Amino acid sequence: MSKALLHLHFLSLFLLCCVCHSSIFTLNFHFTGIVACRPHQIQAFTKFTNEFDTRGCNNSDTFNGVWCDNSTGAVAVLQLRKCLSGTLKSNSSLFGFHQLRYVDLQNNNLTSSSLPSGFGNLKRLEGLFLSSNGFLGQVPSSFSNLTMLAQLDLSYNKLTGSFPLVRGLRKLIVLDLSYNHFSGTLNPNSSLFELHQLRYLNLAFNNFSSSLPSKFGNLHRLENLILSSNGFSGQVPSTISNLTRLTKLYLDQNKLTSSFPLVQNLTNLYELDLSYNKFFGVIPSSLLTLPFLAHLALRENNLAGSVEVSNSSTSSRLEIMYLGSNHFEGQILEPISKLINLKHLDLSFLNTSYPIDLKLFSSLKSLRSLDLSGNSISSASLSSDSYIPLTLEMLTLRHCDINEFPNILKTLKELVYIDISNNRMKGKIPEWLWSLPLLQSVTLGNNYFTGFQGSAEILVNSSVLLLYLDSNNFEGALPDLPLSIKGFGVASNSFTSEIPLSICNRSSLAAIDLSYNNFTGPIPPCLRNLELVYLRNNNLEGSIPDALCDGASLRTLDVSHNRLTGKLPRSFVNCSSLKFLSVINNRIEDTFPFWLKALPNLQVLTLRSNRFYGPISPPHQGPLGFPELRIFEISDNKFTGSLPPNYFVNWKASSRTMNQDGGLYMVYEEKLFDEGGYGYTDALDLQYKGLHMEQAKALTSYAAIDFSGNRLEGQIPESIGLLKALIAVNISNNAFTGHIPLSMANLENLESLDMSRNQLSGTIPNGLGSISFLAYINVSHNQLTGEIPQGTQITGQSKSSFEGNAGLCGLPLKESCFGTGAPPMYHQKQEDKEEEEEEEEEEEEVLNGRAVAIGYGSGLLLGLAIAQVIASYKPEWLVKIIGLNKRRKR
């Protein structure tokens, strides 16, 4: 093969697989037409595939296989996508293919693998594609040996560390490190700025935190610069204007603060996204004159003023314009109406001083989506005789103070998505809505609707896929759902009676939320093939059906706060996708579900307030399984026995800190149609005695355990110190004995620690006093002795946190220790405050009035994730449904 033929770009790989049959053998192992591949190369390839489970290869990419050099017979191109399961080892036979030019191993299941340094031996590589494999750890320094490399894609892994060493990769054209856990600063001396051939750079969704070096301006060949969702701060360097070849510039979701960046020289710019920063000032008039600009996103900044649109801008190419959540004046509307090629427009939360008239958009004949949420809308413009572009497919009018159903929707025959939640509409939903021929997604939550007009048949036979009616005034029996329904949510209404069996006839149903109603009777045994099931806070009875895990698609099950009995279904062992399981506050009587350790993705297990009994240690007294578990909440049951010292050693996910995990969120999304779909992000309301912490989104780096209110005994396992991601530990009200493990001082992220009402002895480890985030500690009613550590976080606690230990002394207790050396004046001040402190303690059971709980809740909601705080005495998990990502994944 000639040298020119070997210089393949990524797309060329597909072409070669299509036209060069004489050089291909595929992974179904029908070795036809393999004359060019030498026998020893075929044997080596077979040896490589034997290192993995290749059962997925039969249904994988049809272009999978290898391609050999016609002159040497050596493997030159290897593509195995969505095919391999296992571990890519450092001594893999892959690294013996020294003639390889292109390797594509994207979307395999290589979890728990570090990125092998052996790749550095493949010095002829020109393209290396390793995205979506779950690789851990740092990029080996041996990668700098790949001096021929032109394309490197390591995106969608779990790689950590600072920016990898790429010095020597001077031929690199494409570098994609997005969706990893890289952190640290980008300094001007970084090897990144030696890559002068670079055309595509994507560092999005990492944890870099620094200013943007001016040396970005030296990468003159850059065409795509994507730095979204990091911690970049400060000003955008003026040298960015040197990148005159840029077609895409994404700086969104950072902490950048400056006036509008200098982009007027970027005459090739096609997409510009500066959303979710702190840019201020006005939009320069020159921006809208850029000849190729089609996508402009400036959401959630501090931009103000108006937008100047010259007469020539009526022929602007601008198709996407997102200006929501800024401080623009009302005059912005008229100039925008001149941008006649607009297809997607977001003007939400403009805070205009007058109602918006929808007629202003009548000139936008191509408009497909319009978001005016958070603005006052002229009631006259919502009537059926008003005008709005008939091309509209998506209309969002949340928080618009609308009190009557908009009849203008009757005219929108192209409408696919409608969200008019969080308004003041009441009465019944009009029958004509379900007659819109293309309607797929309807969100009417947080209004005052009481029912449906007309025949139920119209709704049943509609085209609706997603229907969300949360927080209204519906009551009575659940309506018959559309035959095509995929996601349905009616949380926080007053529905009664049993869940109808007709729901089982909706074969496409994937997500259902019936929480916070008054449903009675059993969970229908016919429910199956669902992904998200939220039934919490009803009056459901009977056992949890075995069929819920048919098809292994179940990802989240929350049946908390019902009257369920029986045992956990053993069929759950087949729920390979299950991440969240919550059965809090039921009457389930069972032993600890050790068998759930077979679930590879389980992150949250909450069994609180049931009738579970017996040991929670495996029969062999070894470590507990659950490598991905982060929230483990089993309080107020009847668990007994002791825990071995190595109990926690397999909890790999809880051992990784935020810096290692990058602070990613627990997110799930599914796209249903062109502009979006449904999804959810898991929100966390973590409240322990003395600590209240709210997160609208639950970071995957958080971990919490609660064993309180059981009959556990023996020593606290020393291995608890391995769980560096722990922010909350509650083992109170048990019979633990022995010393507090010294290893707990390693829990540097710990914010709440409750070990009260046990039989612990010895001293409080001094290391606990140096945990900087520890906002609450309670070791009362044990048998502890000695001086209380005098770290800042300890001495600030209430004295009730240490009472009931006859041998304890030192602040904040009034019993002083001999030789503490505390200043007499300090002791006097403490005595002066005693009476006041005692009165305060009578009024508050927890520090600063913060209650004990980890809140769990659920709600299907298409649109933005809205954090909902549900306070109770013990930990719960708050799961929210979000959806419609109109731009791209966050």
Swiss-Prot record:
For this record, an example GO cellular component is: plasma membrane
Q: Report the subcellular localization.
A: Cell membrane
Any ranges marked Cytoplasmic in the topology annotation, and which?
872-890
Q: Which Pfam families match?
A: LRR_1 (PF00560), LRR_14 (PF23598), LRR_6 (PF13516), LRR_8 (PF13855)
Give the record's membrane topology: Single-pass type I membrane protein
Question: Where do glycans attach?
Answer: 58, 70, 91, 109, 145, 189, 207, 242, 265, 311, 351, 461, 505, 518, 574, 730, 778
The intrachain disulfides are none
Mind telling me which residue stretches traverse the membrane in this protein? Answer: 851-871
Which stretch is the leader sequence?
1-22
The protein's matches in PROSITE patterns, at most eight in alphabetical order, are given as: LRR
On the Extracellular side, which residues? Answer: 23-850
- Explain what induces or represses this protein's expression: By mannitol.
Q: Which UniProt keywords apply?
A: Cell membrane, Glycoprotein, Leucine-rich repeat, Membrane, Plant defense, Receptor, Repeat, Signal, Transmembrane, Transmembrane helix
Can you say where the LRR repeats lie in this chain?
97-121, 123-145, 146-171, 173-195, 196-218, 220-243, 244-268, 270-290, 291-316, 318-339, 340-363, 364-389, 391-411, 412-436, 438-461, 462-485, 487-506, 507-527, 528-551, 553-575, 577-598, 599-623, 626-650, 699-724, 726-747, 748-771, 773-796
Question: Any idea which GO molecular function terms this record carries?
Answer: protein kinase binding
This protein's major location comes to membrane
* Phenotype upon loss of function: Impaired in nlp20-mediated immunity.
Keyword check for Membrane: yes
GO terms in the biological process aspect are:
defense response to bacterium; defense response to fungus; defense response to oomycetes; detection of molecule of fungal origin; innate immune response-activating signaling pathway; pathogen-associated molecular pattern receptor signaling pathway; response to mannitol; response to molecule of bacterial origin
The record ties this protein, via InterPro entries, to: Leu-rich_rpt (IPR001611), Leu-rich_rpt_typical-subtyp (IPR003591), LRR_dom_sf (IPR032675), LRR_R13L4/SHOC2-like (IPR055414), RLP23-like (IPR046956)
Q: How does it assemble?
A: Directly interacts with a 20-mer fragment (nlp20) from NLPs through its extracellular LRR domain. Component of a trimeric complex composed of RLP23, SOBIR1 and BAK1. BAK1 is recruited into a pre-formed RLP23-SOBIR1 complex in a ligand-dependent manner. Interacts with SOBIR1.
Which PANTHER family does the protein's record reference? LRR RECEPTOR-LIKE KINASE, RECEPTOR LIKE PROTEIN 30-LIKE
What's this chain's function?
A: Involved in the perception of necrosis and ethylene-inducing peptide 1-like proteins (NLPs), that act as extracellular signals mediating immune activation. Component of the RLP23-SOBIR1-BAK1 complex that mediates NLP-triggered immunity.
Family the UniProt entry places it in: Belongs to the RLP family.
The name of this protein is Receptor like protein 23
Query: Which species does this protein come from?
Result: Arabidopsis thaliana
Gene designation: RLP23
